Amino acid sequence: MELRIRDVSKTYPNGVQALKQVDLTIPRGMYGLLGPNGAGKSTLMRILATLQEPDEGSIRLGELDVLNQKDELRRTLGYLPQEFGLYPKVSAEALLDHFALLKGVAGRRARKEVVEALLRQVNLWEVRKQKLGGYSGGMRQRFGVAVALLGNPKRLIVDEPTAGLDPAERVRFLNLLSELGENSVVLLSTHIVEDVSELCTRMAIIDQGEILLEAEPLRAVEELRGRIWRRVISKAELPQLEREHRVISTKLLAGRTLAHVDSDTPPGPGFEPAEPDLEDVYFSTMAGRIGRRRERPEPVAP
């Protein structure tokens, strides 16, 4: 079941145009929406979750008109926002039971079965009696997924889910999302390139409300093969290199600067070909849009 987004635009009262004729087709599986903070990702997530209205455009999930059939859509939707509140003095088991009741699971025995199944699925069953205030960031995120999965949603939206997680929690959380993507449409909004490269079979890059690229990550990387060159340079060399070549990113390496250049031919003496990755795709797509300073983020430890 595809999620089809057509010509969706949104301008806020202060004049900021958050989305500009966004057009995407999102198939079943993991789909990554990648972009910097302020790119319009969260606005699109809220619109898809029926929490906000676009100014124009249409959205369909299969035959369902998302904008005009909100109640029907919400029955099939799971949403994990970037930030959400929890009751710190309530246990995970008790709060999930309460949410299941609100979701329409009326029978006590049925709720007990649902709660146990979900807490086991997100690996929180052994700590079900623990108060949520004592949960780590990763545990809270996994509890949020359990809430989002109430009602067996056909579509799951997760907004910046790994921000602030330690490496081990991040791996557990991404593995959980990968399992969910086998049977559902899972839309992952993130500014972390590794999240997309490790999980998603399709992706889009968004900036300033515009879709700049829509592709399969592996194919996008392959299209850069033979075009990425690298060389360690001094800071003093960088301005001239930027004037003469398409420098897509720089990274400090042992006190010196490692520059990546996108070019069909060797940019100059000392440059060597580099194996492209999804970071190169991202920075090549964003080149010229994020200012002169394009520092490559430190990789997230596995």
Predicted regions and their residues:
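Walker A (P-loop) phosphate-binding loop of ABC-type ATPase nucleotide-binding domains
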Residues: P36-G40
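Helix-to-loop junction immediately C-terminal to a conserved catalytic motif
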Residues: A49
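Conserved ABC transporter NBD signature motif
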Residues: G57-N68, E72-L73
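Conserved ABC ATPase "signature" region
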Residues: D97, L101-G104, R109-V127
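A short, proline-enriched helix->beta-strand linker immediately N-terminal to the Walker B motif
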Residues: L150-K154
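Catalytic Walker B motif of ABC-type/P-loop ATPase nucleotide-binding domains
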Residues: L156-E160, L165
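ABC transporter nucleotide-binding domain
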Residues: R172-H260
